Swiss-Prot record:
Region (Disordered): 61-92
Originating gene: GLV6
Propeptide stretch(es), residue numbers: 30-103, 117-123
Name of the protein this chain belongs to: Protein GOLVEN 6
Compositional bias per record (Polar residues), positions renumbered to this chain: 61-78
GO terms, biological process: cell differentiation; regulation of asymmetric cell division; regulation of lateral root development; regulation of root meristem growth; regulation of root morphogenesis
UniProt miscellaneous comment: 'Golven' means irregular waves in Dutch.
Tissues expressed in: Expressed in roots, shoots, flowers and stamens.
PTM annotation (Sulfotyrosine): residues: Y105
Compositionally biased tracts (Basic and acidic residues): 79-92
Origin species: Arabidopsis thaliana (Mouse-ear cress)
GO cellular component: extracellular region
Length: 123
């Protein structure tokens, strides 16, 4: 009976020790107030070659400007400046993330394989 209690205690202790280190890997969604204009966007992507995890990034949102009654400035392309600004921010984010998420290898010059090359004769 005492042996069963000891084995159950050791099993529970082993499970507790295994669960505790992995609980820190779970992502928790923090709450942010809309008055700050910041929202935390959780991105969970892993590039296996570089072994990097991008856990989170801050993204500015213009929720306070969307409800205003001001007229939007329109450029010659027909898009408002706010839309163009959002598009340019998205492009910058993609460029910044490309170095972590890309699977591109450095370019290198390939040599022709050496087949049937005559071996130098030793004297």
């Amino acid at each position: 009976m005492k042996l069963i209690r000891v084995t159950l205690f050791l099993c529970a202790l082993a499970i507790l020790l295994l669960v505790t280190p992995t609980s820190s890997l779970q992502l928790k969604h923090p709450y942010s107030s809309p008055s700050q204009g910041l929202s935390k966007k959780i991105v969970t992507k892993m590039a296996t070659r570089k072994l990097m995890i991008i856990s989170s990034e801050y993204v500015m949102t213009s929720t306070s400007h969307e409800g205003s009654s001001e007229q939007l400035r329109v450029t010659s392309s027909g898009k408002s400046k706010d839309e163009e600004k959002k598009l340019s921010e998205e492009e910058e984010e993609k460029k910044a993330l490309a170095k972590y998420l890309s699977m591109d290898y450095r370019t290198f010059r390939r040599r022709r394989p050496v087949h049937n090359k005559a071996l130098p004769l030793d004297p």
